[in-house]
UniProtKB/Swiss-Prot annotation:
Catalytic reactions on record: [protein]-L-isoaspartate + S-adenosyl-L-methionine = [protein]-L-isoaspartate alpha-methyl ester + S-adenosyl-L-homocysteine
GO terms for cellular component: cytoplasm
Name used for this protein in its record: Protein-L-isoaspartate O-methyltransferase
EC class of the enzyme, as a word: transferase
Organism, scientific name: Thermosipho melanesiensis (strain DSM 12029 / CIP 104789 / BI429)
Classification lineage: Bacteria, Thermotogati, Thermotogota, Thermotogae, Thermotogales
Function: Catalyzes the methyl esterification of L-isoaspartyl residues in peptides and proteins that result from spontaneous decomposition of normal L-aspartyl and L-asparaginyl residues. It plays a role in the repair and/or degradation of damaged proteins.
Enzyme Commission identifier(s): 2.1.1.77
Gene3D superfamilies: Vaccinia Virus protein VP39
Localization terms from the record: Cytoplasm
A molecular-function term among this protein's GO annotations: protein-L-isoaspartate (D-aspartate) O-methyltransferase activity
Length: 198
């Protein structure tokens, strides 16, 4: 279903993971007919589920591996976390934070339905990260920020990768930030459109 993602450099194992997690279960009833289209969709509460190509690109840029401990800021309906959970395997773990209680409940229910036991969903403010389980091998933020929060950099492990859209409501760039021997490097990947980190 997602073979077209190869043109974005998305690997076979990411495409396989996306095919295993049926997107239609992560969107509201009124947009289920569009679940397999490569577009973002509204999931209520002013939030969206990312287009499949964006999920694929972000998974690729995170370079997810077995055993990775991942922090996601912005669970939404849970689709991205579900895909990532397959990529890190049973020995890895996804910690995902959602501030909207209704979405948190929906995502938690979906994770149980899919038998995804390597995901911990937290109801709270993601701007502070999740110090209790830091450091993280990978951190992904699924909403834009005007700057890179220091708390997230502090919670990134050495040789870790942080993906975050940075900008404003009009222009956002997906940044890939690496920490190597305590030094931070930044790379601008592409222009994106996300909801704000609030």
């Amino acid at each position: 279903m997602y073979e077209h993602l190869k043109r974005y450099g998305v690997s076979k194992n990411i495409i396989e993971a996306m095919n295993k997690i049926d997107r239609k279960y992560f969107v509201p009833e009124n947009v289920k007919d569009l679940a397999y289209d490569d577009i973002p969709l509204p999931i209520g509460f002013g939030q969206t589920i990312s287009a499949p190509h964006m999920v694929g690109i972000m998974c690729k840029e995170l370079d997810l591996k077995e055993k990775d401990k991942v922090l996601e800021i912005g669970t939404g309906s849970g689709y991205n976390a579900a895909v990532m959970s397959l990529l890190v395997g049973k020995s890895g773990h996804i910690y995902t934070i959602e501030r909207i209680k209704q979405l948190y409940k929906i995502a938690t229910k979906r994770f149980k339905q899919f038998g995804l036991t390597n995901i911990t969903c937290i109801l709270g403010d993601g701007k502070e990260g999740f110090e209790e389980y830091a450091p993280f091998d990978k951190i992904v933020v699924t909403c834009y920020s005007k700057f890179v929060p220091n708390k997230l950099l502090e919670q990134l492990s050495d040789n870790g990768i942080l993906l975050i859209p940075v900008g404003d409501e009009f222009v956002q760039v997906l940044k890939k930030i690496k920490k190597i021997n305590g030094q931070i490097s930044e790379e601008d990947l592409l222009h994106v459109k996300f909801v704000p980190l609030v």
